[in-house]
Amino acid sequence: SLSQSQELRLLMKMVLDDLQSLQYLENFVKEKDSASETGLIAKMVLGPESSEVSQVDFHAAVPSRFFRDIESVREGMDPGLHEIGYRLELDTARDVWQFKRREDFYIDGDLLEGGREQILSESVVKFIVSFRIETETAAGFLEESFEDYVWDTDERTCFENKSNRCLPDAIQLSMSLQGASGEIVS
């Protein structure tokens, strides 16, 4: 339906806007004994109908969406750098899958937790984020692949060793919604 297509378009725009602002905070993890995480952490988790879906957490240089109630944000002093996360979680009390966006106003040592969660939709049945990596073949050609669905920035080695990338070369997003009638929109 038109409303489902519109909802899907808006959800994908929000996720892609955040992912396009993905940041690797080199100075945040500079200390050798630092346990802080930065960059991108993405994994596959169990989703609707026992399918696998993505769960992503990252730092992004975007204005705050969820902290408009903080006076400094209302006065235009948003730091513009936040922890962001997207996931599908089952509300067991209602047996409904909820697509959520997490935003932590301040960056801290734990990239996976904290901040506020907002339910964006209860219609999402597919959320897949894949990453493109360019690799050089033995013949010296560049080969591209979007087959990686898991990413965990190795904070302290990605600048020293070029085979350990801080961030992917490109990101691909695939989402689907299911309407009340069972129709799936992709």
Language-model regions, residue ranges each:
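Extracytoplasmic beta-strand-rich oligomerization domains located immediately C-terminal to a leader/signal peptide
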Residues: 1-113
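Short linear sequence signals and composition-biased patches located at protein termini or domain-edge surfaces
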Residues: 118-186
